[in-house]
């Protein structure tokens, strides 16, 4: 065991005197942290920052004006923090503290310190401390930033709820194993989900019911999660959380393997995909699966490509769940138009080219027949057609008939935001020919409008856009 291995320890400094040697910005940050935990900071320095001066004038801190003196340690000090930019002063404070067997932290000096102040993530009473032992503080700070984004405020509220009922929980579950099982159930059950939704009163009722052994029936739930267009890196933090808490994942055919790989390993994954050529799983059967597993008390994730509310039938599924009193939540995803355009270097709106964006589903002939083609033929707008590979000849014909210029540029993005991404460009006149020449297959998104010309020099992901030569029959 090496000498610099630290023992993790949280200290109660409430109403305890802590000497901070230094009056600059670093000392100010340390003092602010001490004030948050109710400590009694004594600041020793010739001068103070404006904030430290204000705290001294308002009685929040005590100021010992001058250069460090050993007598400053004769005030029932519990901890010493040396935070000056003068090594000789820091050394003097550390030597004096060591002589009196006090804990001392010298900022950025491992050798002189016998305690380190860690990087901290705070959520109410919940505190997570990270330390590199003083050897690599930037690593600790980086990890803190990662945790800050992963741990939401609901964990602080949950900690408070448990703390308020600590004695009740211990009395109800005197056996430590039974108590552990109770906590595990609450940490992964509806209580936490309600807190995330800011439904605090309902969360308290759930906890009280659990303690009274009358948990509400049907405690399972369904979460509609947008999986984005393919790249697992585009999942939101809430989507990752839901996938890691799921018991059952009902996923669409177009959800990528890389997304499924980040899910909880022991979750059951069931494909419920559809295709343009035929429905492999009926929507009614998907409804039944959600209902069956939620009523069994399981956490169901309905994982959809893109965003659940953009051509994903998410609204229908929520209406069904509401009718059957199944708790639900929705986690949005990056819809295909946004992801594919971004990965192809195409701004969907642009001051010089397009002031509006229209998202269109083209998955079957009946969908195309109901569109207002005259409106879609207007200039200075971007059109994004979803699920339109089979309907490309019809799209080309109807837009041209409605007056959209044959020279209108397009980009056809196959496997957008995935390693296999391919971007094909051309003009409306050559749309169907380009798709046939390159044997385009779903998933593919059609973006039509002047903005697509920017892909030629703004592309950054994968290979450069391709363009099929115009056949003689199409040349005027």
Curated annotation (Swiss-Prot):
Keywords: Cobalamin biosynthesis, Lyase, Methyltransferase, Multifunctional enzyme, NAD, Oxidoreductase, Phosphoprotein, Porphyrin biosynthesis, S-adenosyl-L-methionine, Transferase. Residues 1-207 are annotated as: Precorrin-2 dehydrogenase /sirohydrochlorin ferrochelatase. Pathway: Cofactor biosynthesis; adenosylcobalamin biosynthesis; precorrin-2 from uroporphyrinogen III: step 1/1; Cofactor biosynthesis; adenosylcobalamin biosynthesis; sirohydrochlorin from precorrin-2: step 1/1; Porphyrin-containing compound metabolism; siroheme biosynthesis; precorrin-2 from uroporphyrinogen III: step 1/1; Porphyrin-containing compound metabolism; siroheme biosynthesis; siroheme from sirohydrochlorin: step 1/1. GO terms for biological process: cobalamin biosynthetic process; methylation; siroheme biosynthetic process. It catalyses: uroporphyrinogen III + 2 S-adenosyl-L-methionine = precorrin-2 + 2 S-adenosyl-L-homocysteine + H(+); precorrin-2 + NAD(+) = sirohydrochlorin + NADH + 2 H(+); siroheme + 2 H(+) = sirohydrochlorin + Fe(2+). One of its GO terms (molecular function) is NAD binding. PROSITE patterns: SUMT_2. The active site is at 252 (proton acceptor), 274 (proton donor). S-adenosyl-L-methionine binds at residues 305-307, 310, 335-336, 387, 416. The modification Phosphoserine is found at residue 132. Its EC number is 2.1.1.107, 1.3.1.76, 4.99.1.4. SUPFAM superfamilies: NAD(P)-binding Rossmann-fold domains (SSF51735), Siroheme synthase middle domains-like (SSF75615), Tetrapyrrole methylase (SSF53790). Residues 220-476 are annotated as: Uroporphyrinogen-III C-methyltransferase. NAD(+) binds at residues 25-26, 46-47. It comes from the Bacteria. Then it catalyzes the NAD-dependent ring dehydrogenation of precorrin-2 to yield sirohydrochlorin. Finally, it catalyzes the ferrochelation of sirohydrochlorin to yield siroheme. PANTHER family: SIROHEME SYNTHASE, SIROHEME SYNTHASE-RELATED. In the N-terminal section; belongs to the precorrin-2 dehydrogenase / sirohydrochlorin ferrochelatase family. This is Siroheme synthase. It comes from Xylella fastidiosa (strain 9a5c).
